[in-house]
Amino acid sequence: MKFLDETKVYIRSGDGGAGAVSFRREKFIEFGGPDGGDGGRGGDVWVEAVNGLNTLIDFRYQQHFKAKTGTHGMGRNRTGAKGGDVTLKVPVGTQIFEEDNETLIVDMVAEGQRYRLAAGGNGGFGNAHFKSSTNQAPSWANPGLEGEEKTIWLRLKLIADAGLVGLPNAGKSTFLAACTRARPKIANYPFTTLHPNLGVATIDEKEFIIADIPGLIEGAHEGVGIGDRFLGHVERTRVLLHLVSAQEEDVAKAYKTVKHELEAYGGGLEEKPQIVALSQIDVLDEEELKAKAKALGKACGTPPLLISAVTNKGMTEALRALRSVIAAAKAGEEEA
């Protein structure tokens, strides 16, 4: 499935229906008077957050959305029907911005959340509305009001419990594939992962969602590489798993590079709870493993987890560590 996390959309609510000019026509009633009904309201444009979506790709193929015009008023004081609404269905985690792509309109953070982006125009008054003591038979009615027209931006920030960060080839996609049913593309070259992947991990009968984003390189916060574009997807996570490949010559430098990029990006990423793990340890002998684990522990200030997604070594411990932080964060949110 293709991934799209930002797109521009054009929306227009429906125009109001016109009021009717009509007069009562009945046998034996010579001066029946006006009976033109009001026009119906135009349809609204709504946005709704739904489960089962994790990309905005559908909006690549349709960018224009217009609600229906209200039905015109009719004789016998009949009001026109309201125009049909249009609903944009977006993934949970989608933010809606004004045309400047900076002013936030609404953040769709819960399944079923709905928000009206544009209200339909009011229907026009029929001529019955204008009857007065000085004008018993008005021969005019109002047209309906025009609907709203605007350009908006949709920006997706995936909602996951844990986020995987690290340099390209740190083993993030292999980790995700080993502990979830997600099947990201895996190969031994940088930037194999070109867009975020989500997976559901289960440990001790408890589930949580993991997001894997493309690898970060030095200068990522300034737009170097592709990882910076997707850092927003781990802003909402409760914990980061920072993977450092055992194949790196200098594991301390690799750790510090990513740490610096997270700090430079901002968005609260540098303050987020972080678990550091030395990954791909199956490629090292015992002596090399001890040396690199010691160097990484010195750089990050705590002994790193030692894992291999290929042999499954350390995977259970890593998942339990993530689950523990997530559970503590959720408990804190509930108390607040």
From Swiss-Prot:
Q: Which CDD domains match?
A: Obg (cd01898)
Report the superkingdom from the record.
Bacteria
Domain Obg intervals: 1-159
Q: Which InterPro entries match?
A: G_OBG (IPR031167), GTP-bd (IPR006073), GTP-bd_Obg/CgtA (IPR014100), GTP1-OBG_CS (IPR006074), GTP1_OBG_dom (IPR006169), GTP1_OBG_dom_sf (IPR036726), OBG_GTPase (IPR045086), P-loop_NTPase (IPR027417)
Disulfide connectivity for this sequence is none
Q: Which cofactor does it need?
A: Mg(2+)
Q: Which UniProt keywords apply?
A: Cytoplasm, GTP-binding, Hydrolase, Magnesium, Metal-binding, Nucleotide-binding
Give the EC number: 3.6.5.-
Where in this chain does the record put each OBG-type G domain?
Answer: 160-327
| UniProt binding sites for GTP | 166-173, 191-195, 212-215, 279-282, 308-310
Could you say which residues bind Mg(2+) here? 173, 193
Q: Which GO terms describe its biological process?
A: ribosome biogenesis
**Location of the protein in the cell:** Cytoplasm
Q: What does this protein do?
A: An essential GTPase which binds GTP, GDP and possibly (p)ppGpp with moderate affinity, with high nucleotide exchange rates and a fairly low GTP hydrolysis rate. Plays a role in control of the cell cycle, stress response, ribosome biogenesis and in those bacteria that undergo differentiation, in morphogenesis control.
Q: Which family does it belong to?
A: Belongs to the TRAFAC class OBG-HflX-like GTPase superfamily. OBG GTPase family.
Q: Assembly state and interactors?
A: Monomer.
Give the matching NCBIfam families.
Answer: Obg_CgtA (TIGR02729), PRK12297.1 (NF008955), PRK12299.1 (NF008956)
The record's section on PANTHER family has: DEVELOPMENTALLY REGULATED GTP-BINDING PROTEIN-RELATED, MITOCHONDRIAL RIBOSOME-ASSOCIATED GTPASE 2
Output this protein's name: GTPase Obg
Source species of the chain: Rhizobium meliloti (strain 1021) (Ensifer meliloti)
**Corresponding gene?**
obg
